[in-house]
A protein has these predicted regions:
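C-terminal and late-domain segments of enzyme folds
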Residues: 1-20
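Active-site catalytic microenvironments in core metabolic enzymes, especially phosphate/sugar-handling
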Residues: 11, 20-131
Length: 131
């Protein structure tokens, strides 16, 4: 799971890029609706702090998953805090592409643009159905 300590660690390390492996369409726990989830509000704040200087991309843990940050309210909240989507790139590919993007870019914004650009078929326009 995601907790505040993990985000604090990432902020302290001053990484240039981070990949978050979400569930399904790119979900992560950020909605607070009871005592058990009240720390999710702090997760939102830390996520926003992390994205100030760090490229943060969301990928899916589903084999044929595609991140879509405009479907559910939680994903919109994550997107609004500066997290970009890795489309249908697997976590491992997202990691390599992020490293390459950071190496090509002169700043965070350029790295985010490079990461989200399809260069060699690594991002499909539509995901195939494998059901």
């Amino acid at each position: 799971g995601m907790d505040v300590d993990k985000l604090d660690f990432l902020i302290e390390q001053d990484y240039e890029g981070v990949i978050i492996e979400g569930t399904g369409l790119g979900h992560m726990p950020i909605s607070a609706f009871d005592e058990e989830t009240e720390h999710h509000t702090e997760i939102q704040e830390k996520l926003e702090e992390l994205t100030e200087d760090t490229v943060v991309a969301m990928t899916s843990n589903c084999i044929h998953g595609r991140v879509d940050m405009d479907v559910y309210d939680n994903q919109v909240k994550v997107k609004n805090r500066g997290v970009i989507k890795a489309e249908d790139m697997h976590p491992e590919l997202s990691y390599v592409k992020l490293m390459w993007s950071l190496g090509q870019a002169s700043d965070k914004e350029e790295a985010e643009n490079i990461f989200q650009e399809n260069y060699n078929g690594e991002i499909l326009k539509r995901s195939e159905y494998h059901g």
